[in-house]
Amino acid sequence: MGKEKRQKLIFKEAVEATTDVKEGYCEGIKAFGEYKSKIKVPEPSKIDGSLDIDVTTAKLYPDDSRWDYALCYDSEVFYIEVHSAITSEVSKMIKKPQWLKSWLEKKAPKINKLTTKTKQPYYWVQSSKCDIPRHMPQYKIAVQNKILPMREWDYSKILKKEK
């Protein structure tokens, strides 16, 4: 079995071994549904799969600030939240990674093991335009929490920022 095929199996197996989301694995970026256009990668064959965490955990945690998606690309898992990018949503976006980190640690350790260690793992992708003016305190809060919104999740741009 080739390395590429094995890596895809590892992410799929991690999802299937996680009781909360065991039926949620999707090939490619299918989990993103209407937001597929927000995901850009240089080599689509390196997409190991995706997971809609929000939908698959909604009944289990209806009142929690659930995270939207997990994407495994090139054997690393990234977490992407497609959400309104307005000042009133910044506080919600601060809570969401906290929920995700706790959920990964307690309920999804196999997925957590695949989380990228070499890059920022959490990304806020704006669902439409961004309206968080730089002079507003919410902008500073988003910067401090390393969760500024972006138009799209573009792996090539992320690589450039990390270098």
Residue map of PLM features:
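Short acidic, S/G/P-rich loop/turn micro-motifs used as interaction or catalytic elements
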Residues: 60-61, 85-89, 129-133
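Mg2+/Mn2+-dependent nuclease catalytic core
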Residues: 86-103
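Acidic-basic catalytic patches of nuclease active cores, encompassing PD-(D/E)XK
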Residues: 1-61
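Arginine/glycine-rich "motif VI" loop of SF2 helicases in the C-terminal RecA-like domain
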Residues: 102-116
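Conserved catalytic cores of phosphodiester-cleaving nucleases, focusing on short active-site segments
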Residues: 69-71, 75-86
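Domain-level recognition of nuclease-like catalytic cores that cleave nucleotide substrates
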Residues: 4-12, 112-163
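Short, flexible loop/turn motifs enriched in small residues
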Residues: 62-66
